[in-house]
Amino acid sequence: MRLVIGISGASGVVLGYHMLKVLRFFPECETHLVISEGAKLTFGLETDLKIEDVEKLADFVYSNTNLAASISSGSFKTDGMIVIPCSMKTLSGIATGYAENLLIRAADVCLKENRKVVLVPREMPFGKLHIRNMKEASDLGCVIIPPLLTFYNNPQTIEEQINHIIGKILMQFGLEHEKFKAWEGTKDD
């Protein structure tokens, strides 16, 4: 399996970091990483992580300005892409096909090649334009998975919440995250 991981400048870049950490447990999964400049700034604001440490988790790393990278072409086969978190600017670019950088171009390529694209939009509250762009992206074939809190899995920590979100995303690619607690119904089922 070959996945493109895009980390854009929305709040919640730690979600992208955790996604890369979890994907390391799937040796069959080759990861291709693009980090936007906004995301690099957000890592500095929200975490103590160094960009180099995030990049080390990926098999391949690309500059967001390199529109000639392998992942910018449909002939480079992938199983899809995850944009985590997905800023509203990136969402807008994907929804309208305005591929001004590699992250958006890679998503555009996945869509034109009928490959799965999962967007994890991080904004609150969503404005009408955000919702319209999510609908447009969904109509194009994107799966929209906002990183919402869940409670049926009885989480006790932020890490458990993050693992649940990661698990929901990985399900889209047929991967099972061992720390994901699926709903098993009530005891009366």
Curated annotation (Swiss-Prot):
The keyword Transferase applies. Induction: By 4-hydroxybenzoate and 3,4-dihydroxybenzoate. Its EC number is 2.5.1.129. The keyword Flavoprotein applies. It is an enzyme of class 2 (transferase). HAMAP family: ubiX_pad (MF_01984), ubiX_pad_yclB (MF_01986). This is Probable UbiX-like flavin prenyltransferase.
